[in-house]
Design a protein with these regions (language model features):
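Multi-pass alpha-helical transmembrane bundles in non-GPCR membrane proteins
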Residues: 1-246
Length: 246
């Protein structure tokens, strides 16, 4: 799997940076989302479950961007090899972190906790497998696992669509589409817009930033809590007609 993320990155290096565009894009992204995290977490104050779930999503997003930026900054060697494994493992963290506030805030009972336990169990296994057995995972298998994990939330999207409507879930759907398109570009190693500057991996980074932006926009809708408005039934009182006195 390493080749999809490292060996095929054809970038013009700088003295201090192996892949400038990839590193700088996610470095700036980490800064922007760190600032946005303050606003997001403040929006969720007042309930510990809500606030904690927003912290998890914000931390997983920023951490992934930092790991990615550091990996693309480094030159070949043991440090870069480790950062590569951590960077790819961070995608599992991002998927689970992104789903955490969705189920923690919008669901209750078993729909909340059992789903979160399942999501995080898969993420932990994926992270451990990626860090320890990375050399046994091919490009296609690795990227397919990410797509399956990400689109595993389709059932959640359907439930939210039926409950709140298309306008509510539209940012989340666009986020999923952005991640998917980026993964496809990465898997097929194309297209290349400007050789050495804007290739498949740089396009993947843009897709990640776009997906994060849309998903955060989605979560901002209910970060402070969401009251489900249900239409009230109109009660019609039946009054039998009375005959007029003859």
């Amino acid at each position: 799997m390493d080749s999809a993320f490292m060996d095929d990155i054809a970038a013009f290096p700088l003295p201090f940076c192996r892949e400038p565009m990839s590193s700088i894009s996610h470095m700036l992204g980490a800064f922007v989302f760190a600032v946005m995290a303050v606003l997001l977490i403040r929006r969720g104050r007042g309930d510990w479950v809500r606030t904690s779930s927003l912290v998890v999503m914000a931390a997983s997003s920023v951490l992934l961007l930092i790991l990615s930026s550091a990996y693309h900054l480094a030159w070949p060697g043991p440090t870069r090899d480790f950062l590569l494994r951590a960077d790819v493992a961070g995608i599992f963290l991002l998927i689970a972190g992104s789903m955490t506030p969705v189920h923690a805030i919008l669901f209750t009972g078993r729909s909340r906790w059992l789903t979160l336990v399942g999501i995080w169990s898969i993420a932990i296994v994926g992270i451990l497998f990626r860090m320890i057995f990375h050399q046994w995972v091919s490009d296609a298998v690795g990227i397919s696992i990410f797509l399956i994990c990400g689109w595993g939330s389709l059932a959640t999207a359907i439930v939210l669509w039926r409950r709140f409507g298309w306008t509510f879930i539209k940012p989340a759907v666009f986020a999923g589409a952005s991640y998917t398109l980026g993964a496809i570009v990465l898997l097929f190693h194309g297209p290349t817009i400007i050789h050495g500057i804007m290739g498949p991996h740089e396009l993947w980074h843009i897709a990640v930033l776009s997906g994060l932006t849309m998903h955060w926009r989605f979560v901002f809708q209910f970060a402070s809590g969401l009251q489900i408005s249900r239409p009230r039934l109109k009660v019609i009182h039946y009054q039998p007609a009375t005959r007029e006195a003859a």
